[in-house]
């Protein structure tokens, strides 16, 4: 899946944005989230999270930002892999970040109770 962010901005523009994030927020990770299969939409797709955040904490932040129904399950995919909630995002960032400095995440919502 091609990221909307990559389609909208050139590699150089994205690199500049990630560098600005690193300069402004030391020890943080720039993430771009593509939302698919969502009943609600959000304007916020760029996130800056602390190095120690887990995937579970990122899911909680997304859920709070979008005020999702508790019956909705969220799944995060990085490079077409479902990532366990206990995984520290900085570990994934080191192996899966893009050339532009962002970690691209696909977030999918599924209604689990009907």
PLM features: what roles do these ranges have?
Residues 1-114:
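Ubiquitin system architectures
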